[in-house]
């Protein structure tokens, strides 16, 4: 038979239980968007035995965000100059050619074209 508790002790136990259930609700964490998993996948393709520190990953993430922002801004400017309201792959391609130097631009354009072709063929 369980030991009997006094009326006050039972009330206190009940209150404690209520407090736990009130404060027990988990706060929903806001997701941090990052290119970390994609940067890591590319790193492993290029150098399978190499790791990356969290600080280096943060720098790479900032770099990718910066480049994408620059490309988007340049593509927007190009669309505005040509009185267009839509940014197409053509504007993106031209923006890349304007922003990236020489051989890097050629490689970026060819990889981008390949990605767009793969995407449209999979539909």
From Swiss-Prot:
Annotated positions of the N6-succinyllysine modification: 44, 114, 118
Give the span(s) annotated as Disordered.
1-31
Residues passing through the membrane, by range: none
Q: Which residues carry this modification: N-methylproline?
A: 2
Q: Which GO terms describe its cellular component?
A: nucleosome; nucleus
PTM remark: Phosphorylated by the catalytic component of the Dbf4-dependent kinase (DDK) complex Cdc7.
State the PROSITE patterns in the record: HISTONE_H2B
- Which residues carry a glycan? 110
Which residues form the Glycyl lysine isopeptide (Lys-Gly) (interchain with G-Cter in ubiquitin) crosslink? 118
Name the UniProt key words of this record, in alphabetical order.
Chromosome, DNA-binding, Glycoprotein, Isopeptide bond, Methylation, Nucleosome core, Nucleus, Ubl conjugation
- Describe its function: Core component of nucleosome. Nucleosomes wrap and compact DNA into chromatin, limiting DNA accessibility to the cellular machineries which require DNA as a template. Histones thereby play a central role in transcription regulation, DNA repair, DNA replication and chromosomal stability. DNA accessibility is regulated via a complex set of post-translational modifications of histones, also called histone code, and nucleosome remodeling.
Q: Which PANTHER family match?
A: HISTONE H2B
Query: What protein name does the entry list?
Result: Histone H2B
Query: What organism is recorded for this protein?
Result: Drosophila sechellia
Organism lineage: Eukaryota, Metazoa, Ecdysozoa, Arthropoda, Hexapoda
